[in-house]
Amino acid sequence: MDAMKRGLCCVLLLCGAVFVSPSQEIHARFRRGARSYQVICRDEKTQMIYQQHQSWLRPVLRSNRVEYCWCNSGRAQCHSVPVKSCSEPRCFNGGTCQQALYFSDFVCQCPEGFAGKCCEIDTRATCYEDQGISYRGTWSTAESGAECTNWNSSALAQKPYSGRRPDAIRLGLGNHNYCRNPDRDSKPWCYVFKAGKYSSEFCSTPACSEGNSDCYFGNGSAYRGTHSLTESGASCLPWNSMILIGKVYTAQNPSAQALGLGKHNYCRNPDGDAKPWCHVLKNRRLTWEYCDVPSCSTCGLRQYSQPQFRIKGGLFADIASHPWQAAIFAKHRRSPGERFLCGGILISSCWILSAAHCFQERFPPHHLTVILGRTYRVVPGEEEQKFEVEKYIVHKEFDDDTYDNDIALLQLKSDSSRCAQESSVVRTVCLPPADLQLPDWTECELSGYGKHEALSPFYSERLKEAHVRLYPSSRCTSQHLLNRTVTDNMLCAGDTRSGGPQANLHDACQGDSGGPLVCLNDGRMTLVGIISWGLGCGQKDVPGVYTKVTNYLDWIRDNMRP
């Protein structure tokens, strides 16, 4: 690792995307999907790609000449062409525009700090503001660590957002693979190639408000806090220390300011390592160590995809939209193999919340299995995580008649202090603050693998989601639920849309028990209820009943303590 730190070199893009020389071209074949290949030309410095027979202009370094190039069998063929000043402004941020004399191609010569076809890329931007809609920086890594795909890639031609859109420049898209937020999502994202297909994923781009916090997001590349101790307790050396002469990452690095290095000894991650680190002296020997900087919570954040298929009782969903959803399976004494039992909710790396009534058969813990990251109920997912159960705790005052105190905790089994590993399909939900009171009729979401309707003999083959509204307490009473007991430990939610007997109203159903009812609070999905019971499924003016999580925060914390 120490040798890697000496050898790595981080290069920021400080010049226009078209400043290349023939020796910088890479002739490559790009894998497309899982079957075919397509010959392209790629610029090594800027990652700009060009399809077969595509043409472009480029300035020649240290020269006033401009070349006309085209991509031929993976090789750029170029020759000089006469140019003139553009008849209309086409370059942003003070770029100088030149147009070919005999055809319409143009090239922008960008001032320092900007790049791109139209100088629209801000190479000095290290974080994003608000939702990142105006972010034009050069971050190109997804939260999973996957490298973003160039927006101009032919593999994205059929995607709703690509560099080929007429409004691509306005949206920040183009011949690059940098994170953007063209659809006004919650933060910048990009397309990545995973599991044999291209899909969207949030980027690990830091928010500007995160940079100076006392914790780090992702791998901590954007961490700008003041921690200066390593995991062993050693003090970090200043990045401008004379002892570091000859090292790559010091205050003398040409990109030091952008990398967060300077006349200080604060922990940083300039080379994209797993987490922030620093140089230290141990036994009079210069080495490096990871820092004792805590990771920031990412609970309740997700890569939400709009469901495409409406089915009875809700909508088919992808697990990345509900990464805290767990599937609990059990071995029954009287039947071979495992059977789906209930839903669950990931609230920390090693703990799952569920409903107490799911465990009335008093299964031995080793008969239970918890699966995270699975979209299809019985089909293994490529990124799923599977765990045995160390123990489970059912609330001592659970009433199996009224379902009061319908809550349980499952501890996942692990050889270390961590169990579930965070990814785009596995992430904790936020527990609510004790005083959380959302307005009546707030729209919330539930998810699960339960039945489409009450009389169906089968559970859903795929994860579903449903959209319901929180009922006021005056409508969550016994008289609204056929005189069934309703306690202060319960809350109600249902689909309030109008419609006749055939209306497809959203609701939880058998098999969804133990799953989450989540609502947006302070920009994060927050757990307000655990799916508990109801009268049928999807009946008009009949809400579902959920365990009120705010009543059990102390119980949860007490039982999670070692």
UniProtKB/Swiss-Prot annotation:
<feature type="site" description="Not glycosylated">
    <location>
        <position position="253"/>
    </location>
</feature>
<dbReference type="Pfam" id="PF00039">
    <property type="entry name" value="fn1"/>
</dbReference>
<dbReference type="GO" id="GO:0009986">
    <property type="term" value="C:cell surface"/>
</dbReference>
<feature type="disulfide bond">
    <location>
        <begin position="41"/>
        <end position="71"/>
    </location>
</feature>
<dbReference type="GO" id="GO:0045177">
    <property type="term" value="C:apical part of cell"/>
</dbReference>
<keyword id="KW-0964">Secreted</keyword>
<dbReference type="GO" id="GO:0014909">
    <property type="term" value="P:smooth muscle cell migration"/>
</dbReference>
<dbReference type="GO" id="GO:0001666">
    <property type="term" value="P:response to hypoxia"/>
</dbReference>
<dbReference type="InterPro" id="IPR001254">
    <property type="entry name" value="Trypsin_dom"/>
</dbReference>
<feature type="disulfide bond">
    <location>
        <begin position="509"/>
        <end position="537"/>
    </location>
</feature>
<feature type="disulfide bond">
    <location>
        <begin position="350"/>
        <end position="419"/>
    </location>
</feature>
<feature type="domain" description="Kringle 2">
    <location>
        <begin position="215"/>
        <end position="296"/>
    </location>
</feature>
<feature type="active site" description="Charge relay system">
    <location>
        <position position="513"/>
    </location>
</feature>
<feature type="disulfide bond">
    <location>
        <begin position="69"/>
        <end position="78"/>
    </location>
</feature>
<feature type="disulfide bond" description="Interchain (between A and B chains)">
    <location>
        <begin position="299"/>
        <end position="430"/>
    </location>
</feature>
<keyword id="KW-1015">Disulfide bond</keyword>
<dbReference type="GO" id="GO:0060468">
    <property type="term" value="P:prevention of polyspermy"/>
</dbReference>
<feature type="disulfide bond">
    <location>
        <begin position="236"/>
        <end position="278"/>
    </location>
</feature>
<dbReference type="GO" id="GO:0099183">
    <property type="term" value="P:trans-synaptic signaling by BDNF, modulating synaptic transmission"/>
</dbReference>
<dbReference type="GO" id="GO:0005615">
    <property type="term" value="C:extracellular space"/>
</dbReference>
<dbReference type="Pfam" id="PF00089">
    <property type="entry name" value="Trypsin"/>
</dbReference>
<feature type="active site" description="Charge relay system">
    <location>
        <position position="406"/>
    </location>
</feature>
<feature type="disulfide bond">
    <location>
        <begin position="110"/>
        <end position="119"/>
    </location>
</feature>
<dbReference type="GO" id="GO:0097180">
    <property type="term" value="C:serine protease inhibitor complex"/>
</dbReference>
<feature type="disulfide bond">
    <location>
        <begin position="444"/>
        <end position="519"/>
    </location>
</feature>
<feature type="disulfide bond">
    <location>
        <begin position="342"/>
        <end position="358"/>
    </location>
</feature>
<dbReference type="GO" id="GO:0042730">
    <property type="term" value="P:fibrinolysis"/>
</dbReference>
<dbReference type="InterPro" id="IPR000001">
    <property type="entry name" value="Kringle"/>
</dbReference>
<dbReference type="GO" id="GO:0004252">
    <property type="term" value="F:serine-type endopeptidase activity"/>
</dbReference>
<feature type="signal peptide">
    <location>
        <begin position="1"/>
        <end position="22"/>
    </location>
</feature>
<keyword id="KW-0325">Glycoprotein</keyword>
<feature type="glycosylation site" description="O-linked (Fuc) threonine">
    <location>
        <position position="96"/>
    </location>
</feature>
<dbReference type="InterPro" id="IPR018056">
    <property type="entry name" value="Kringle_CS"/>
</dbReference>
<dbReference type="InterPro" id="IPR013806">
    <property type="entry name" value="Kringle-like"/>
</dbReference>
<dbReference type="InterPro" id="IPR050127">
    <property type="entry name" value="Serine_Proteases_S1"/>
</dbReference>
<dbReference type="GO" id="GO:0036211">
    <property type="term" value="P:protein modification process"/>
</dbReference>
<keyword id="KW-0645">Protease</keyword>
<feature type="disulfide bond">
    <location>
        <begin position="215"/>
        <end position="296"/>
    </location>
</feature>
<comment type="subunit">
    <text>Heterodimer of chain A and chain B held by a disulfide bond. Forms a heterodimer with SERPINA5. Binds to fibrin with high affinity. This interaction leads to an increase in the catalytic efficiency of the enzyme between 100-fold and 1000-fold, due to an increase in affinity for plasminogen. Similarly, binding to heparin increases the activation of plasminogen. Binds to annexin A2, cytokeratin-8, fibronectin and laminin. Binds to mannose receptor and the low-density lipoprotein receptor-related protein (LRP1); these proteins are involved in TPA clearance.</text>
</comment>
<keyword id="KW-0420">Kringle</keyword>
<feature type="region of interest" description="Important for binding to annexin A2">
    <location>
        <begin position="42"/>
        <end position="52"/>
    </location>
</feature>
<feature type="glycosylation site" description="N-linked (GlcNAc...) asparagine; partial">
    <location>
        <position position="219"/>
    </location>
</feature>
